[in-house]
């Protein structure tokens, strides 16, 4: 494990950041449902935010719990797992293979058994297994765009071969409860999110049909973990095999930019 402070001179932000909201705060439920995601390959790290959208309990396998996290497609698209579902298991370059997946949150480090003088920090945890792509919002509608529109897009990005898609995907995240770190993620991250999801009325209420006039009268808040320069305390729990180990100094992850929690209105 590792405790590392990331100093940044002239650090400023106009957003509400890096606080653990009280249960009475209006955005406490949003906080419970939101997580930082990090996908690592030999080439780079990809950062994003995930939100609990569904789960599969342990009724068929007492040692495995499956969480489904909604995220942006441009984040999930960097997942290169040869054991993924077809067609997402097709990987052209071995350097692009995802080597680790981390889930994080701005929270109390003592929840993970680390007692320091730091009351709150950005805590992220390497899971025992890689996620899979449960859903990607690509080619789900046969858009009939004017040919001139597609021509202009292809002129901008000729190598991409753009097709209709929405920036939305769902990752299937396995948690092996006989693994110490996975169990702690389930206990301290996922269980509070499930309780919040149910308190909001479960999917029946969350995705209920709402009139456009009602939507126009609502106020919306975006809560997530963007990658920004910061001076927050960051704690990284790493796995070797399926156990929690102390990470030698030479193996520590060096963080230049840090994902951290923001609330935007």
Swiss-Prot record:
It comes from the Bacteria. Pfam families: Mycop_pep_DUF31 (PF01732). InterPro entries: Mycoplasma_peptidase_DUF31, Uncharacterised_MG067. Belongs to the MG067/MG068/MG395 family. This is Uncharacterized protein MPN_581.
């Amino acid at each position: 494990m590792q405790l590392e402070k990331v100093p940044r001179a002239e650090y400023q932000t106009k957003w509400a950041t890096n606080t653990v909201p009280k249960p009475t705060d209006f955005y406490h439920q949003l906080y419970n449902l939101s997580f930082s995601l990090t996908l690592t390959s030999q080439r780079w790290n990809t950062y994003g935010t995930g939100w609990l959208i569904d789960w599969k309990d342990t009724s068929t396998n007492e040692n495995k719990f499956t969480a489904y996290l909604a995220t942006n497609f441009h984040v999930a698209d960097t997942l290169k797992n040869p054991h993924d579902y077809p067609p997402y298991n097709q990987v052209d370059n071995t350097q692009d293979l995802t080597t680790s997946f981390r889930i994080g949150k701005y929270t109390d480090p003592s929840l993970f058994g680390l007692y320091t003088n730091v009351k709150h920090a950005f805590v992220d945890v390497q899971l025992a297994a890689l996620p899979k792509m449960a859903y990607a919002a690509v080619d789900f509608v046969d858009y009939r765009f004017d040919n001139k529109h597609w021509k202009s897009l292809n002129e901008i990005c000729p190598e991409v071969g753009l097709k209709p898609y929405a920036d939305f995907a769902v990752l299937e995240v396995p948690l092996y409860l006989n693994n110490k770190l996975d169990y702690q993620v389930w206990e301290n991250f996922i269980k509070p999110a499930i309780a919040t999801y149910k308190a909001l009325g479960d999917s029946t209420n969350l995705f209920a049909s709402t009139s456009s006039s009602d939507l126009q009268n609502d106020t919306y808040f975006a809560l997530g973990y963007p990658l920004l320069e910061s001076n927050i305390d960051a704690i990284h729990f790493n796995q070797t095999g399926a156990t929690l180990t102390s990470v030698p100094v030479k193996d520590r992850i060096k963080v230049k930019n840090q994902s951290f929690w923001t609330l935007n209105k």
